[in-house]
Every structure is written in structure tokens, then in C-alpha cells.
Amino acid sequence: MAGSTKDIDALIELMARLPGLGPRSARRAVLHLIRKRALLLTPLADLMGQVAATARECLNCGNVGTSDICDICTDERRATGELCVVEDVADLWAMERSGVFKGRYHVLGGTLSALDGVGPDELRIPRLADRVTAEAISEVILALNATIDGQTTAHYIADQLGGRVRLTSLAQGVPIGGELDYLDDGTISAAMRARKEL
């Protein structure tokens, strides 16, 4: 790029590695940050340094925060006996945004995958079993993605925890506002199997 420096090029390359950003979007973002240096770039750089120094994984559930035990795990009001199991932190944050779940979470850190060589010990499944006992959990809600690996993981967890705790999973099927014509066969099939009385 004409007139650029190595530092700016390096920043663009790093930004382009972020999910959802390619080289063009990264260039636009960096240019915008430079133009708004006092308003955006400097505070962003300061906060990124602070987060880099303080961010850590919750030792209990796997959420991301700035202390060893996250705010959700330390909130006594959330000790409802319900534990929502999710694949990753982004899923936990999505559940929190919805505001429908008021219990605690357990982040697996992925799903079982024979192709990728991911077994139970690479995930937080053993810790999940420990928490069910230690925290007197009455229900484990499996909020895993409706993929082959997600369902394989759900079945494995069900085998490991079966009989010790009530196990439920999120309903699957037609989304609100969804039209059957636009849905894939698997979604329609899941919706038919999960149908309920009116």
C-alpha cells in the first residue's frame, strides 16, 4: 500500500485474521481507527492491553471474565440447581442475551469429533460430571448445536450422567417466523418429531 508503514500493515494483517473480517474490511477498520485516533484507537488499544492482561477462563464453568470464578458462578441467585451445557463461550453469551435462563452454565470447549481427534478428555466433560455431584444439580440442559458432533456429544453426556440427574435438551424445529418452504429436510423432520399438543 502506498504511504503505509510496517506497523499499519501489520495491524491490518492482524485485523484480517479476526472472524468476519477480510483484508478489505480490515483496511477500512484500521483506516477508521486511525482517523478517530482519540475517540477510538487509543481507548481501544488501552482496553485491549488491559483485557490481554486480565482475561481468563472461569475455573468453574469455562466462561471468560477477569477473575478466576466468573460473575455468573458467584451469583447465589443463579444457584437454581439447573446447569445449561453449551459448546463454547459464544453460546453462553447468546443464552445470556436471550434472558430466558437464570441458572448456571458449563462450557464444554467444543464437541466430540472423531475426525478431529477430540475426545471427552479434551473437553470439560469430566468437570461437568464433578459439578453435577458437587453442586447438587437437579437438571442438566444440553444446549448444544444441532450438528452431528453436537448430537454425538449430547448422547455421550447423557450416557455419562444418565440416572444421576434430569437431562433435557433444547427443542429443535421450525423457528418463529420460519416458512416451511425455506427449511431444510432435517429441520422439518426434527420439528415433526418434537411436535406438541395445542
Curated annotation (Swiss-Prot):
GO MF terms held by the record: DNA binding; zinc ion binding
> Keyword rRNA-binding, does the record have it?
no
SMART domains named among the record's database cross-references: TOPRIM
- Residues in domain Toprim? 81-175
Record-annotated membrane-spanning stretches:
none
Query: Which stretches does the record call C4-type zinc fingers?
Result: 58-73
Instruction: Sum up the protein's function in the record's words.
Output: May play a role in DNA repair. It seems to be involved in an RecBC-independent recombinational process of DNA repair. It may act with RecF and RecO.
The family note in this entry says: Belongs to the RecR family.
Q: What is this protein called?
A: Recombination protein RecR
